[in-house]
Each structure stands twice: as C-alpha cells, then as structure tokens.
Amino acid sequence: MTGSRIAGMVAVFVLPGIALAVVPTSAWADDTEPARPHVELSIRSWLFTNGETKWSHNASGLDPQLGNPTSKLTYKDNNSHILELSGKVNFKKDWFAQVDGGFSVAFHRGTLTDDDYSAVGGQHLFSQTTSNITGSGTQFVNADIGYHLRDYPENRGNLNVFVGYQYWRTQYEASGVTQVVCAPSGIPGLTCNPAGTISNQGQVVITNTTQWHSLRIGVQSEYLLTSRFSVEGKLAFIPASYLQNDDVHHLRQDLQQDPSFSMSGYGIGADVEAGARYMIYRGWFLNAGYRFWWNYLLDGNLTVHPVGTPSASVPLTEFQTMRYGFTLGLSHTF
C-alpha cells in the first residue's frame, strides 16, 4: 500500500474524529452513553489487509546433498478484505464474555515464492518459482472471557483483562508456475525448467491450509477524550499456539494428495489493535483503527507423504503467519 493511500485513509477516518473531539462536551450532555451497557454488537471490516505465511524445512538429514534450509515457501496476499461480526455481554458487574468471527470476502491478489536449495558445492539457491495466489482466504474465531479491572477518574474509561481462545485459518491456492531462477543443483535427477519458463497457467498447483489454535491473554482499554469521542487499544499475548499445516502439491505424482506434506508444532504470537470510537447517536458508534496479528513457530516438524513408501519427518526451520491492516466498523450498545 502506498504512502499516499495510507495518508488518505488516515485523513478520512481519523481527522474528522479529532475535529469532533475538540467540541465542548457540554454540547453533547444529552447524548452521553450509559456507564456500562449489558450488550454490544458490532460489524466491522478489516480493510486492505496484507497477509503472509512462510515456512522452511531442513531435509539434509535425509540426504546431505540437500541444503539447509532445503525449501522455503512464502505466501503473500495483498488488499484482502475481511468481514467481522462480534458480540460482547457484561455480567455479574465486573465480568464480560466476547466472541468475534471473521471471514474473507475478497481474496485473490498475491504471490507464492518457492525457493529450493542445494548443499553441493556450498549452500546455494538452485531453483526459484513464483505462482499467483487465490483461495478461500482467512477465517477466524476469538472467544474471550474478561474482568473489569478498573475505571479511570471522572468516568473517562476503563481497563480490562481477558483470557481466551483463537482459531485462525488461512488457505492459499497457487496457480501457474513461472521459473525465475534455475541453476545446476549438483544432485542427480534434481533439475528445473530454464529461467523464464511459464507453465500450468490457470491450473492450481499447490493448496496450502494453515490452522493455528491459540491461547490468548491480554488487556484492553478505552479512554474518553469527550463524551462522544474515545481512543481504545487491545493487546493480546499468545503464550501457547498449536500449528496444523497441510500442503498439497497437485503436480507431484510421487506424493500423496491428501496431503503431500503435513506440518505441526508449537509456538507463540501476539495480537495488537489501536483505534478510535465516535458516538454518532446514543448507543451507536463508528469505530476505526489498525490491527496486527502474528503467530510464530518455536518447534515443529514437516512430514512428507510419498506414494508407495513410508512417510518421513524432518525439522521445520521456520513457520510464521501474520496479517495487518485498517479496520472500520459500526457498533451498538444496549
């Protein structure tokens, strides 16, 4: 996303709110929100998000001619739009439960880069290909329970803590193959097409499905600058996350197709969100902000599933998933 585009969005979403924030609060005295509503329902769009999943593995333990890493795959999508619905219920004075769910409504721009390495003659890249990305995109569910920790002086806002579960799934489909780099691997039978070769146009060649199951612990806060305008933030640390990743290489007749490679492991992560909130009418709010999610593998394995021979496992050297972008939404409290 270009700097001018970001600046334009900031101007549209943030500057009107700042201007409204300086209006005297007494002018809005009749529209102030009740102290703590029982229910809040929201619809939100995660706009122009960029996503990335990348992983690599080390198969040199099976064949010392292979590099370390042996392969590195990077899936990147751009300007994907995600629709999100959420509900929050306050109960027993200081407790609340919140559920968020989202799914992609536009997901068709991106690139897969597939790098392969040889150790013959020293570690070197001998093949690089790129493919166009489509797929079902991203879906997620967050389910949290929280506690109202404190109110700020003069009823200016509050600070809450929460713990919960996050399910985050991303599926990429890579279509077509463009050979960018091809050099001698030094490994008998391991070759590539000449650089510049384009093949399998319009054909899905790889399907990759990533699933993270995560424990979240975090804090969230809202601070009122006026009776209508507030700023808010949310920070969640993920101390434990379980990864499941299936990779199907549709052109590889020597590999099984359900899946060709499977990956699993444990990691950590973080979710960060900051934004502003403006009451347009009693109980109705416009929300705008920015969000960043990240999950990172600490330890895991890749298992290859060949046809006719036993499966074999090798260590993953990297696996991480991230997504970031602006948010814009409408919420109602009652």
What is each residue range found by the language model?
Residues M1-H38:
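Cleavable N-terminal export/targeting peptides
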Residues D30-V39, K92-A97, R150-L159, L225-V231, ...:
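Short loop/turn motifs that connect adjacent beta-strands in outer-membrane beta-barrel proteins
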Residues V39-T49, V99-V105, Y147, V161-R169, ...:
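Transmembrane beta-barrel strands of outer-membrane/channel proteins
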Residues G51-S80, F103-V141, Y167-W212, P239-E273, ...:
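Extracellular/periplasm-exposed beta-strand and loop segments of Gram-negative cell-envelope proteins
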Residues L85-G87, V141-I145, V161, I217-V219, ...:
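Membrane-embedded beta-strands of outer-membrane beta-barrel proteins
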Residues G87-F91, Y147-L149, S221-Y223, S227-F229, ...:
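Residue-level signature of outer-membrane beta-barrel architecture
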Residues W212-L215, Y223-L224:
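Short, surface-exposed binding/anchoring microloops in extracellular/periplasmic proteins
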Residues Y281, R291-L298:
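Short Gly/Pro-enriched loop/turn and capping motifs at secondary-structure junctions
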